Amino acid sequence: MAFVSMKELLEDAKREQYAIGQFNINGLQWTKAILQAAQKEQSPVIAAASDRLVDYLGGFKTIAAMVGALIEDMAITVPVVLHLDHGSSAERCRQAIDAGFSSVMIDGSHQPIDENIAMTKEVTDYAAKHGVSVEAEVGTVGGMEDGLVGGVRYADITECERIVKETNIDALAAALGSVHGKYQGEPNLGFKEMEAISRMTDIPLVLHGASGIPQDQIKKAITLGHAKININTECMVAWTDETRRMFQENSDLYEPRGYLTPGIEAVEETVRSKMREFGSAGKAAKQQVG
């Protein structure tokens, strides 16, 4: 089964007011858990490799081959997007596309808007030739993303309008108060700004740093145009908690399958729960493949 672009998936999600989850992969077993959760929930899914973890995971070609083989061997029939998360340059995005990724995010959010737009346009021009969807970011999401620490900088509505019109991206991550990693205190999303940006750009929005955001805020973000929601920290915490518990209760355990399996099962349950929360469960039949 070939990977699919997220363009049509997100357009349907935005129109029907649900969201598709992006879940970051951290290895083969982790990927299996995400795919199995999607199949059980009959939900489309976005499996993402963060640029900063690509080499750790074996490189773009290895990742694409691994995920593709798992889809085939596990008889996965739901739509699967293979996405590059936080692509650091146009060249990295090209490498991902050439390796078979069906979607990329170019993250020029730490650059001045003119440079961000130029970098993004370079990616969208190349991606369009290969049927690959493109996500871009304006403003900066706070917290830590795979070692990159930053503060929150709200997206400027004029900059959002410019990048959408000048680059023809398929989805926009507009930073509006979310953070990567664990929240210190109650999350406080900028719903007023969110509504204005959604109305002005009229394309699917992406919520980064969604782990730990209360369900009522998630649902409100979906009604205001967010069709893609990124989850990573909650999965990592679920895995770590279960793995730590296994060692605490079984100090003599040394077989990897014995101590890794409970954590992977916790990841699967977390993903399934998020798919139900986002409203994507049962939506795979609309674009069934296989």
Swiss-Prot record:
Main EC class the enzyme belongs to: lyase
Coiled coil: none
Pfam families xrefs: F_bP_aldolase
Keyword field: Lyase, Metal-binding, Phosphoprotein, Zinc
Protein's UniProt keywords contain Phosphoprotein: yes
Reactions this protein catalyses: 6-phospho-5-dehydro-2-deoxy-D-gluconate = 3-oxopropanoate + dihydroxyacetone phosphate
Binding-site residues for dihydroxyacetone phosphate, renumbered to this chain: G181, G209, A210, S211, N230, I231, N232, T233
UniProt xrefs under InterPro entries: Aldolase_TIM (IPR013785), Class_II_FBP_aldolase (IPR050246), FBA_II (IPR000771), Fruc_bis_ald_class-2 (IPR011289)
The protein's annotated pathway: Polyol metabolism; myo-inositol degradation into acetyl-CoA; acetyl-CoA from myo-inositol: step 6/7
Active site: residue positions: D85 (proton donor)
Gene3D superfamilies (UniProt xref): Aldolase class I
Modified residues (Phosphothreonine): T233
EC number: 4.1.2.29
Alphabetized PANTHER family for the sequence: D-TAGATOSE-1,6-BISPHOSPHATE ALDOLASE, D-TAGATOSE-1,6-BISPHOSPHATE ALDOLASE SUBUNIT GATY-RELATED
UniProt record similarity statement: Belongs to the class II fructose-bisphosphate aldolase family. IolJ subfamily.
Official protein name in the record: 6-phospho-5-dehydro-2-deoxy-D-gluconate aldolase
